[in-house]
Each structure stands twice: as C-alpha cells, then as structure tokens.
Amino acid sequence: MHFKKLGIFSVALSGLLLAGCNNQDDSSATIEEKLNYTINGIEPGSGTMGLANNTLQDYENLNNWNLTESSTAGMLGELDKAYKNEEPIIFTGWNPHWMFAKYDLKYLEDPKKSLGEIENINTIVRKGFKEDLPNAYTIVDRFYWEPEDMETVMTDAQDSNFEDAANKWVEENSDTIAEWTAGVEKGNGEKISIISTPWDTEDASSHVIAAILEQHGFDTEITPVDPAIMFQAISTGNGDISLAPWLPITHESFYEKHKDDFIDLGENLKGARLGFVVPAYMDIDSIEDLAPKK
C-alpha cells in the first residue's frame, strides 16, 4: 500500500498593574468571557466549518462570536490543554472519534439543527469502476462497519499508525472479512486509487479497505485531500473510490454538485455525528445557553 500526502493548505510596574486590572480570567468572569466569545474550529475546507459558520448566523446569540480556523491537531491540542486545567472550551467535534474515549465530553444541544442530526458516511466510486474491476467493486460495495469498529482503529492508531491499526482490525475480524470477500476472485496487482480526507475517521476507513483489498491481491494508494477535491477526483475519474462523504448534511453541497458524475454505493457507516462540543465539567447544555457578545 502506498500513502500519498498532498499539500493543501521590561514591562514596567504600571503596565503590570494595568494588565491585572483588565484581566477577566478570574472567578468573576463569565464562561463566555473566559472563552473570549470564541469557538475552536478545524481546517477551513471541511464541511464541518461551513456548518459551524452557518450556526453562528442561525443563532442570534452567536452572531458576534468568533470561529477560529485551525487544524484538527491544533484543535485537539487546545482541548487537551484546557481539559488538563479544567478550563472552558467550545470546539467543533464529531464522532466516531477517540477524543470521546480519552475525555469526558458532551455535545451542546442544537435546537435549530444547524449542525445537522445523525449522519451517515457513504462509499462512492467513479463511473466505470464496476466494469473495470468487478471483483474489487464487490468488496468495496459490501464494506460496512459500526462506529465502534472505526473508533477501535482510531484509538489503536494513537499508539502506532493507521496502517498497523487497520491490519490489526482486519486480522481480528477475519470472519467479517470472509463474508465481504466470499466468492470474489483475487486480484492480480491491479492498482486502486483511494481518495480520502485528512481526518482520523477517514484515515481509519481508508486504511481498512486498503488492507482488505491488498490482502485480496490489489495494489492500493491512499490520497488525502479536502472534501471538495475528493468529490472532484472521483467525479473526473482521477480516483477510483472514496469512503469519506458525510451525508446528508456535512458534504451536501459537494455531493449535489457532482452527484451525476459518480456512483453512490450507500452507507458504509451509520450513526456519525458532529456539533459543538464541551467538556462535561462545563455547566452548559445548549447553544442557546450562550450569552451574546456585548
């Protein structure tokens, strides 16, 4: 298996006294003030950030709040720092993800459903893939797993890497793999391009399907790109398969733009979710509980 990574994207005493007078990070500051009216986001090209920006517009109390662009690693770093100090933080989160196993977290209620509800993750393939590689197509079409399976791979990858974690999952679930490959003739080194996105959820699914296909005689390459490029690659035939589309909300705009140019094989996972997430120690339960910026 090959893995291709693309590039995307002194102080005077009087000053100390003044800083002390203006510092709101004390027991009298509200949660919103301690947060600096800011929600921690991830990569700007993700569907999650588009929904998060819409949410700030949908809720009048959030109209003047800030949504910071970062990376998933950067967001997780901020979460870890805040959690260790029991400080408030609001961030864009989703599951399946190992963060929910490592930290005690909760979703803020979203009465307007601006961030969607339960999501599915679908499998799409380029037109002609079934005719060109019918055996691989059958395996890819049969691939379906549960959120707990994905989280297992994601968690194991924290102590190793996704290739090793995927191989471990495949080995431990040989009966399931046997069902997916039953009656399917082995490949002869045919190359299969897997287009993924740069997040742990898709790292997990892409590496697992790659491990299964490799085990069955195919040669795979995984390329992580932004969601817009992922849909474009499959639609133009520059990639063979993707297990990355989140539907019906997160990637809806990309899906609608290209839906006539690829084949949708349906869900490979049901029960995914995204939203605004906080540590369980924070005394807040809903987006509507947040005070507007003064």
Where are the regions that the model predicts?
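Ligand-binding "clamshell"
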Residues: 86, 99-112, 252-265
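A conserved helix-loop-strand patch within extracytoplasmic ligand-binding domains
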Residues: 26-40, 126-130, 137-138, 144-147, ...
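Short helix-initiation/N-cap motifs at beta->coil->alpha
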Residues: 67-78, 199-200, 221-233
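Periplasmic-binding protein-like
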Residues: 73, 100-141, 267-275
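C-terminal motif of bacterial Sec signal peptides marking the signal peptidase cleavage site
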Residues: 16-20
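Short, glycine-/small- and polar/acidic-enriched structural segments
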Residues: 204-218, 222-286
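Short, well-ordered beta-strand elements
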Residues: 29, 33-41, 140, 188-201, ...
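Bacterial signal peptide processing site
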Residues: 22-24
